[in-house]
């Protein structure tokens, strides 16, 4: 049914294939948006650089991309402090990419803005990867 929404979670090719078949898609490729992966594999800069609109789509196909989503398989990391560390600051990068126009893409400016959030993370005793800020 074309009423279904496809979650393109393996890589972009699955999302692209669904778009070409007429489905609406939420892009969530493991290459950029799996936050249980190490920072060595998926650094915050890579999350921030992610563009959910693959090259070569028609305007109509692009319009069926509903957004992006991060994934975190919690059976791998079950401790809250570890989960928080894996999420922050990557979830902030994902958020900015999700709500911003594609032209908003200066990672260094983003990093400066995110440093403001450090105070909140510390206040709420939330673990985060300070090396990524």
Residue ranges and their predicted role:
Residues 1-133:
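Flexible, acidic glycine-rich loops studded with aromatic residues
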């Amino acid at each position: 049914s074309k009423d279904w929404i496809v979650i393109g979670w393996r890589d972009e090719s699955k999302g692209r294939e669904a778009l070409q078949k007429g489905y609406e898609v939420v892009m969530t490729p493991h290459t950029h948006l799996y936050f249980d992966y190490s920072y060595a594999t998926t650094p915050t800069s890579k999350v921030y650089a992610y563009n959910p609109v693959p090259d070569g789509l028609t305007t109509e196909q692009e319009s069926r991309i509903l957004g992006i989503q991060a994934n975190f398989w919690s059976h791998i990391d079950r401790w809250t402090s570890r989960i928080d560390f894996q999420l922050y600051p990557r979830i902030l990068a994902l958020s900015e990419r999700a709500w911003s126009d594609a032209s908003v893409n200066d990672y260094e400016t983003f990093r400066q803005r995110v440093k403001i959030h450090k105070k909140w993370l510390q206040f709420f005793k939330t673990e985060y990867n300070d090396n990524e800020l």
